[in-house]
Amino acid sequence: MLVFSFDVQPYKTSVMAMKKMMMTMLLLVCSVYLGFAKVPNNKLNEQLLRYDYSQVLMRNDLLGYIGNGQRLYMHFDTIYKDKANPHWYHVEGKSKVKQNLCSFTGRIDLHSFAPNEQVDPNFKRYKLKAQYRFDEDKTQKGSGFFAGSFSSYFIIYQDTAYFDSIEDGADGYNNNQFEGHWTSYRTKASKKANFGVGRIPDSNDLDVGSAEFYVTPNKQHLGWESYMKAFETVTPEGQKAQAEEDREWWKGDKEIYISWQSKTEHGAFKLDIYSNKHYLQTLDLGKIGSEYWVDQRDYNFDGHRDFAVWLYNLTKRQVFLWSEKQGKYVHEPFFDKLESPTIFDEAHCIVDTHDVSNDVVEERMYRCSTRGYRLISTLLRHPSNSKILQMKVYDDAGRCVREVQNPTYKQLTPLWQKYVILYFLGY
């Protein structure tokens, strides 16, 4: 049985949390529980080691600290499974403390698996444990190595391992937890160095948040200023902090740093865009309110970050796609008509959610190609329970070629099945 839930406004943290909590509760109530046969741990390890966990490990929405709470930035460039040893995953990445950027290489060694609580019959949940060591480049200033223990929650769906964020939005949610130390090559001194998704292990002296990670006031000066200021989304200072948080710092000298400044001219709200602090262009958003949120993600799957502006008072966004040919952002009118788009990366699709009536919600799936965005399928569902009312599939000419009333999960197209698992469940 399926439960559909959407984060329709990414800037509304409380809405996100509420929807994901409702989704989890409904799954627990409505799903058919799948228990595990009691399998010896070594047998379970053997079964699960055949999967590739590169994408589970390759999460870069990491928060970290070193020593007494100084902010630690970590980024993985590549993670891949060893061809000979299924326990080993080779890692390359970057670390940063203050302005000191280092490259590192290393390995994550998986050593055990355990089943996790099941909430849906269409996939299975597990936890893995591992050890890690990441060696920074010895020729770089202030370098050393990271070492410690690691844990991660994941799901198995259609014979593939995926990162488990079903409980994202719940108080205390965390995943991909790295807990250990950093040791200096030069002095041999060690410092606690922990990082993870959602929360940081052993961070009680730093994190005082309940619903989400929140830095205690007396440690915010330790590199957390922009992180905390970015919570003030409607202020100029908050927007400046958000631009800082969105930086691709791991690219070093090759980074393209996008920032912006708002202004109003003749009643029109505009954003001046800067690339590496040099003026690039002005985006005219029209006669709207001045409360907005910027989202720098890839909306047309071409490898470039785009510039989307959420308009608070209209609950809509305007999307400006990066044009390599023109060297600037270009308005994409397709998104103007959407109510609540979600980026479905795995399929190069955009899925939009809109209310048909009080009792019906429609999900529209558009596939992105060089020719633009094309509607390929729709779902009608009840807004407050798991009932799917209708599915339609469309051909290239926009004709409906398949229609199913009250479809079951197995009757959904493979793309809808995957979307349900990866996105409706918080992936």
Q: Where are each of the predicted segments found?
A:
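Terminal domain-start segments
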Residues: 37-86, 230-294, 397-427
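Acidic, small-residue rich beta-repeat scaffolds with periodic aromatic anchors
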Residues: 168-262, 349-427
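Beta-propeller fold detector
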Residues: 330-336, 375-380
